Amino acid sequence: MLLFDIKRYAINDGPGIRITIFMKGCPLACVWCHNPEGISPRAEKLYTRKKCIGCGACVDVCPTGALTLTEAGIVTNRSLCRTCGRCAEVCPTLAMEMSGREYSIDEVMREIEKETVFMDRSEGGVTFCGGEPLSRPSDLVALLDRCGALGIHRAVDTTLFASPDTVRSVMERTDLFLVDLKHMDSGSHRRFTGVPNERILSNLRMIAEAGMDFLIRIPLIEGVNADEENISRSATFLASLPWERKVVNLLPYHDIGKGK
């Protein structure tokens, strides 16, 4: 499977101290996305201009001549780049980085098991996010099963934009869903994320009616969904769900993803 990050000692991705596994690939393309490197399901080369010192080491090792050093920094000829990662390997300042590394199920489990002492003492666990973890259902299910066999608390941070069958399969193996709710109007949802919201709302109602534990996270973004009408419609919809926890986290917008 392709991951683009593993975050240890996470305290905002579910109860206790957790390890968060970032799975690459997402069917949404939110205009405010703070992890745009997680959208593509393939490995990518990332370049951060402000980190670049203009040493040219990446240019020297590129096997296809795809890189050029200019006054504006490194320019990549996308038609020549094979995403081999040689440039990232030699970059001394991490201006060039690869987003996406292949892991086996066993490799991911070894990383998770390293953190069990912190999980046990804090009643924490593992959180799978992305990207969109439901876009890699077979990998996600395998990891959830392995974690469940070890008694590790399992959370899935998701948009719920997936087939009902995928959601049901994950439901059987998950202790907590962290659900991102973007917009109640389907047209606006498509405009700002690239997909409509009917499937998301239907899946959310399904997990609620199944008695699953979940909490809602709403990023409030001026000009997108922070208006009174959308907030009121969100509250009305959530109040209609058979939902014991009834926790909604309102997340202030930040522009950390602009530089990515």
Locate each region found by the language model.
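N-terminal pre-triad scaffold of radical SAM enzymes
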Residues: 4-57, 74-83
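Hydrophobic packing within well-folded, soluble alpha/beta domains
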Residues: 30, 52, 58, 62, ...
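Iron-sulfur cluster-binding cysteine motifs and their immediate structural context
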Residues: 31-38, 57-75, 86-102
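Short helix/strand-capping connector loops at secondary-structure junctions
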Residues: 259-260
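Fold-independent oxyanion-binding glycine-rich loops
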Residues: 6, 24, 36, 78-79, ...
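Conserved AdoMet/S-adenosylmethionine-binding subsite of the radical SAM
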Residues: 106-256
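Structured beta->alpha junctions
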Residues: 10, 51, 80, 100, ...
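Extended, non-globular alpha-helical segments
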Residues: 47-53, 100-115
